[in-house]
From Swiss-Prot:
One of its GO terms (molecular function) is magnesium ion binding. This is DNA-directed RNA polymerase subunit beta'. Zn(2+) 1 binds at residues 60, 62, 75, 78. Keywords: DNA-directed RNA polymerase, Magnesium, Metal-binding, Nucleotidyltransferase, Transcription, Transferase, Zinc. InterPro entries: DNA-dir_RpoC_beta_prime, DNA-dir_RpoC_beta_prime_bact, RNA_pol_asu, RNA_pol_N, RNA_pol_Rpb1_1, RNA_pol_Rpb1_3, RNA_pol_Rpb1_3_sf, RNA_pol_Rpb1_4. DNA-dependent RNA polymerase catalyzes the transcription of DNA into RNA using the four ribonucleoside triphosphates as substrates.
Length: 1201
């Protein structure tokens, strides 16, 4: 067998008849499959053992030779070679066709490749192939032209007139003759000549023909091979036939299709031998052609061949296509051994890196390991008895199992795996029961909850796999989210509530103002009921083991609460003592105002102080981020476990309950509603008098009700007791938000109808009072729409992720520095006056392109190619610098990937990115994963002339597919001053712009809102009206970089509006893939074809060679491709074929004789090679291990050291 890791590239081409015969082990002559009585394959049939190999290992068909000792013997009685039955998966056969047939892929595709080569229309071809018309193959000395079509009558007339003076034929034979006569050299030269003068349609056609001709010429494929003389038969194990219970047989559709071909082929042979009339032979040939068409691609032409129950049969093409096809079902996603799945339950007492594995599941997963160990320990004599022991569940196997799984990580995966945190490694601990135990903190990353979710377990087998799982995938290593570098393991729900309750402060609580000598004394007093968790007390600061206190502070008293003392015990000693939820306290030190002299009257001091807010979810997140920055992974994961345990413990002690009595109603609600009703009445009167339009009335009514709801909400918040359990839950960020509470205790407010329009009748009741029937009915609209939207959004978002992954899967960090001298100038992204993404966030973790100096002091803040840390970014912004040039993926020169410097920091680890990191896939996941959170709906902007501005998921798709946006803005093609804005007829406006050497006017429809006024200075490509710019128009007016900047800003706007943060670099990687191609306009002296779509790198290299040899380089214009188009235009045909339009991609690749260099990830997964990313990248695979020096024998026991 072929060693999969040892080949460089894969090539695809057309097969010549001789090639097909050379693959074959014999000709299939009969349509029979197996004998139903003996269940043995029929000889020369579709399952023949002589052709395809024996059914049983080392046994011939007649049984004369049995056993492995006859290996390689060919039986003299039945002609079957004695070998393994596995050969039935790889041996092919063939069918010698009695008449040539055309291959439907090349004749039917769009554009028809056969049509282009022969310069005939697909309609004409169809008439010839399916025996409706004759075609002249040799005109001889007649007035007929070659390739002219003749009807039956015309043919007869010319035959009588000229006799044998010309030859014409029909069917694939005639096509084959014409194809064989084509002189590719001559045709290409003629086409190149024609191109010099041709225009319009003729030029396009010539370019397309030239492309196909060149493809045939360069690949060495012969055009006549598009017509088949021999048909290959695929190995029988790939189209199996199995016996069902009850003696019936189930068979692959391919066998039916092959049977039809063989039957018709044999019948045609017989008719030809008998010398049957022409019309009968022609009909049989047409039927053979149709049978072969159905075998190759059933349903492509005419009605598909159907099996029982009118179901179309699955042909060879269908075997490859779609989600259930060979590519996506078996090559890119396989079922694997050493895996299992079960329901998950919470494991609150696990460590961050552990998971609980049910005993019986662990036993099954680690069976071979346990068997080996049983034999190794002498508990079983051989593997067989070890296996028997395991099956009987003998008591001694459990100790062995524990030993085996110790330090052997397993992978846990929850579907849908939207980003790389959907698969993480854990160390298993054995648990009773049949459910997997999962650590509560990793739930956010998996998006898991315990309402019946299931998870899959996989066992990494090899030492390398275990090492990678432990070092890279262990849950304790994956604390940061790759999309924005923020911690993803923040506590939630009970943990948040517990820590919130712990850090609450209460006035006049039991024991307020008591002074304690140390933490232990305070805890003792708390346990005995002398003080409360929330009591504000004083503790001698010197007794607190915090390294941040100054010597002065150690002599003083620290004002804090018992709860905060306990909370601070979970933090590292050198972390500031956290007494208030402020940035200063977290990052620098405990504010000095909390330290008082020992002589102070503590009670009076405390009584005079304001209460401090407790620690909410966001603060806990900030604490984790801060601990991570200062102490790195190990300490952070330990601290997280302590925070989790403390949270659960205290929330249990707090004993939060929710009852209907906790929902207090608002006294003033009635007055507010009365007032709103009056206002609405007034508005309606104004409308009746004709003072306002219906639209204005609607807008105002909605405004009134929204204001009323907000007022009720505001009053509710004020009237609430801070210790109200519902308030605590939502204030801490554990569950729910203020709008939920308003609906419970205030009013539900306005609802939307199915079209998304707001119904102007508000729901004035709340859930505490109960809704009227009408109110309940109105509210069902919104509820139902919410559910359907969610279901649709999930599918859309998943498909978006798939396309993103496909377009960027080969973007890998390939080198340390690409040495580019270009960069991207960035400033804060704004929408109007609102800052969407501040400069600081855009700078952090990037490399500077130029030296950055302070504008006033001229002191160097960062040198060229320095990494901009958070501190430097803050310095830059504080210095008042508004734009900075940084290294960016947009300007990276690395071929097939990005370099370290242009990419910047790896957000998932907070350190420099490694060579081999698959940043393309990470980018695709980071953009696709939050897709489900984006809303589906297109918002109606207020105002009479409100255009629909697409937002949310549809807008993201619009950007990445480079479609013409809805609500398109008009852009200017010249830069200059707006000299006039005049109103034309139909209330249109005309804007005139005076450039330096050009003057342009634009007509603006009256519904559009202007962004400019007279006297404004505009740049080329700037939008004159509100709306989205069409990036394809922008690329015509401006350069590539400004299009890239625009797309980046637009994507960020959509995500940030929804409160989702994504690192710029991910969007940069994706956008760069959309602008990789260039359309050649003028070929110069190069041998590139005009109109070709080329990779920018290939184009530049071709031009460099041309300039070096002193000839004229080609010119081209950059093209913006949507992600689907860009994935299909990739150089790798394997990757493109496994994405979409499989047959088209393969047809094209076969004609061009394409080579797939296996640079991306998908191609290698399809072939079963190691992916060229991470430790599989070339530079790591080629490392050889060498012994540096032998170490001396270690005699000390480890415990003694």
């Amino acid at each position: 067998m072929l060693d999969v890791n040892n080949f460089e590239y894969m090539k695809i081409g057309l097969a010549s008849p001789d090639k097909i015969r050379s693959w074959s082990h014999g000709e299939v002559k009969k349509p029979e499959t197996i004998n139903y009585r003996t269940l043995k394959p029929e000889r020369d049939g579709l399952f023949c053992e002589r052709i395809f190999g024996p059914m049983k290992d080392w046994e011939c068909s007649c049984g004369k030779y049995k056993r492995v000792r006859y290996k390689g013997v060919v039986c003299d009685r039945c002609g079957v070679e004695v070998t393994k039955s596995k050969v039935r998966r790889e041996r092919m056969g063939h069918i010698e066709l009695a008449a040539p047939v055309s291959h439907i892929w090349y004749f039917k595709g769009i554009p028809s490749r056969m049509g282009l080569v022969m310069d005939m229309s697909p309609r004409a071809l169809e008439e010839i192939i399916y025996f409706a018309s004759y075609v002249v193959t040799e005109p001889g000395d007649t007035p007929l032209e070659k390739k002219q079509l003749l009807s039956e009558r015309e043919y007869r007339v010319y035959r009588e007139k000229y006799g044998k003076g010309f030859s014409a034929g029909m069917g694939a034979e005639a096509i084959k003759k014409i194809l064989a006569d084509i002189d590719l050299e001559k045709e290409t030269n003629d086409l190149k000549e024609e191109l010099k003068s041709a225009q319009g349609q003729r030029r396009t056609r010539a370019i397309r023909r030239l492309e196909v001709m060149e493809a045939f010429r360069n690949s060495g494929n012969n055009p006549s091979w598009m017509v088949l003389d021999v048909l290959p038969v695929i190995p029988p194990e790939i189209r199996p036939m199995v016996q069902l219970e009850g003696g019936r047989f189930a068979t692959s559709d391919l066998n039916d299709l092959y049977r039809r071909v063989i039957n018709r082929n044999n019948r045609l042979k017989r008719l030809l031998d008998l010398g049957a009339p022409n019309i009968i032979v022609q009909n049989e040939k047409r039927m053979l052609q149709e049978a072969v068409d159905a075998l190759i691609d059933n349903g492509r032409r005419g009605r598909p061949v159907t099996g029982p129950g009118n179901r179309p049969l699955k042909s060879l093409s269908h075997m490859l296509k779609g989600k259930q096809g060979r590519f996506r079902q078996n090559l890119l996603g396989k079922r694997v051994d050493y895996s299992g799945r079960s329901v998950i339950v919470v494991g609150p007492n696990l460590k961050m890196y552990q998971c609980g594995l049910p005993k019986e599941m662990a036993l099954e997963l680690f069976k071979p390991f346990v068997m080996k160990e049983l034999v190794g320990r002498g508990l079983a004599h051989n593997i067989k008895s070890a296996k028997r022991k395991i099956e009987r569940m003998a008591p001694e196997i459990w100790d062995v199992l524990e030993e085996v799984i110790r330090e052997h990580p397993v992978l846990l995966n929850r579907a849908p795996t939207l980003h790389r945190l959907g698969i993480q490694a854990f160390e298993p601990t054995l648990v009773e029961g049949r459910a997997i135990r999962l650590h509560p903190l990793v739930c956010t990353a998996y998006n898991a909850d315990f309402d019946g979710d299931q998870m899959a377990v996989h066992v990494p087998l090899s030492a390398e796999a275990q090492a990678e799982a432990r070092i890279l995938m262990l849950a304790a290593q994956n604390i940061l989210n790759p999309k924005d570098g923020k911690p993803v393991v923040t506590p939630s729900q009970d943990m948040v509530l517990g820590n919130y309750y712990l850090t609450l402060e209460r006035e006049n609580a039991v024991g307020e103002g008591t002074i304690f000598k140390d933490i232990n004394e305070a805890q003792l007093a708390y346990q005995n009921g002398y003080v409360h968790l929330h009591s504000r007390i004083a503790v001698f600061a010197g007794s607190i083991p915090n390294e941040r206190f100054t010597d002065e502070q150690r002599k003083q008293l620290l004002i804090t609460t018992v709860g905060k003392l306990i909370f601070n015990t979970i933090l590292p000693k050198s972390f500031p003592y956290i007494n208030e939820p402020t940035k200063f306290n977290l990052e620098i030190e405990t504010p000095a105002k909390y330290f008082v002299d020992t002589t102070t009257d503590v009670r009076a001091h405390i009584a005079a102080q304001e209460l401090i807010d407790p620690f909410k979810k966001k603060i806990l997140g900030n604490i984790i981020a801060e601990v991570f920055k200062k102490f790195h992974i190990t300490e952070t994961s330990k601290m997280l476990d302590r925070m989790k345990d403390l949270g659960f413990k205290i929330s249990t002690k707090a004993g939060m309950t929710v009852g209907i009595a906790d929902i207090l109603t608002l006294e003033e609600k009635h007055e507010i509603l009365e007032k709103a009703h009056d206002t609405v009445e007034k508005i309606t009167k104004s409308f009746r008098r004709g003072l306002i339009t219906d639209d204005e009335r609607y807008e105002r009514v909605i405004g009134v009700w929204n204001a009323a709801k907000d007022e009720i909400q505001g009053k509710l918040i004020l009237s609430l007791d801070r210790l109200n359990p519902i308030f605590m839950m939502q204030d801490s960020g554990a569950r729910g938000n203020i709008s939920n509470f308003t609906q419970l205790a205030g009013m539900r407010g306005l609802m939307a109808d199915p079209s998304g329009r707001i119904v102007e009748l508000p729901i004035t009741s709340n859930f505490r009072e109960g809704l009227t029937v009408l109110e309940y009915f109105i509210s069902t609209h919104g509820a139902r729409k919410g559910l359907t939207d969610t279901a649709l959004k999930t599918a859309d978002s998943g498909y978006l992720t798939r396309r993103l992954v496909d377009v960027a899967q080969d973007v890998i960090i390939r080198e340390d520095d690409c040495g580019t001298d270009r960069g991207l100038t960035i400033k804060a992204i704004r929408e109007g006056t609102e800052i969407i993404e501040p400069l600081e966030e855009r700078l952090e973790g990037r490399y500077s392109r130029k030296t950055i100096r302070h504008p006033e002091t001229k002191e160097v803040i960062a040198r060229e190619n320095d990494l901009i840390t958070e501190a430097i970014a803050t310095q830059i912004v504080d210095a008042g610098i508004e734009e900075v040039t940084i290294r960016s993926a947009f300007t990276c020169n690395t071929k097939h990937g990005v370099c370290k410097k242009c990419y910047g920091k790896n957000l998932a680890t907070g350190t420099e990115v490694e060579v081999g990191e698959a940043v393309g896939i990470i980018a695709a996941q980071s953009i696709g994963e939050p897709g489900t959170q984006l809303t589906m709906r297109t918002f109606h902007t207020g105002g009479v002339a409100g255009d629909d501005i697409t937002q949310g998921l549809p807008r993201i798709q619009e950007i990445f597919e480079a479609r013409n946006p809805k609500g398109q803005a008009i852009i200017t093609e010249v830069g200059g001053e707006v000299v006039s804005i005049e109103e034309g007829r139909d209330r249109q406006q005309e804007i005139t712009i005076q450039g330096t050497d050009d003057r342009r006017s634009y007509n603006i429809p009256y519904t559009a809102r202007l962004r400019v006024e007279e006297g404004s200075i505009v740049e080329r490509g700037e939008a004159l009206t509100e709306g989205s710019v069409d990036p394809k128009a922008l690329i015509r007016v401006r350069d590539v970089l400004s299009v890239q900047e625009y797309l980046l800003a637009e994507v960020q706007k959509v995500y940030r509006m929804q409160g989702v943060e994504i690192g710029d670099k991910h969007v940069e990687v994706m956008v760069r893939q959309m602008l990789r191609k260039i359309r050649v306009m003028d070929t110069g002296d190069t041998n590139i074809l005009p109109g070709t779509l080329m990779d920018i790198h290939t184009f530049t290299e071709a031009n460099r060679d041309a300039i070096l040899s002193g000839s004229q380089p080609a010119t081209g214009r950059p093209v913006l491709l949507g992600i689907t188009k860009a994935s299909l235009e990739t150089d790798s045909f394997l990757s493109a074929a496994s994405f979409q339009e499989t047959t088209r991609v393969l047809t094209d690749a076969a004609i061009k004789g394409k080579r797939d260099e296996l640079l991306g990830l998908k191609e290698n997964v399809i072939l079963g090679k190691l992916v060229p990313a991470g430790t599989g990248i070339g530079r790591y695979r080629k490392l050889k291990s060498e012994v540096i020096k032998e170490t001396a024998e270690v005699t000390d026991e480890i415990t003694n050291i």
